[in-house]
């Protein structure tokens, strides 16, 4: 089983981000500084996790809102 790689997005200008799930392609809006793990509404994969600051994401950041 391969490990999912999480990265911090650069230049987060808004409070919310549109993130695309790597597993199913679903796009959902996520708070940029979450206090809990964020899972995909469609497939249940973890797409973001808290770090005490800006989130770490396993998906692709589409847009900063």
Curated annotation (Swiss-Prot):
Binds 1 zinc ion per subunit. Keywords: Metal-binding, Ribonucleoprotein, Ribosomal protein, Zinc, Zinc-finger. GO terms for cellular component: ribonucleoprotein complex; ribosome. Gene3D superfamilies: Zn-binding ribosomal proteins. It holds the Pfam family Ribosomal_S27e. Zn(2+) binds at residues 21, 24, 40, 43. GO terms for molecular function: structural constituent of ribosome; zinc ion binding. Its cofactor is Zn(2+). The keyword rRNA-binding does not apply. A zinc finger (C4-type) spans 21-43. InterPro entries: Ribosomal_eS27, Ribosomal_eS27_Zn-bd_dom_sf, Ribosomal_zn-bd. PROSITE patterns: RIBOSOMAL_S27E. GO terms for biological process: translation. Part of the 30S ribosomal subunit. Belongs to the eukaryotic ribosomal protein eS27 family. This is Small ribosomal subunit protein eS27. The lineage of its organism: Archaea, Methanobacteriati, Thermoplasmatota, Thermoplasmata, Thermoplasmatales. The gene is rps27e.
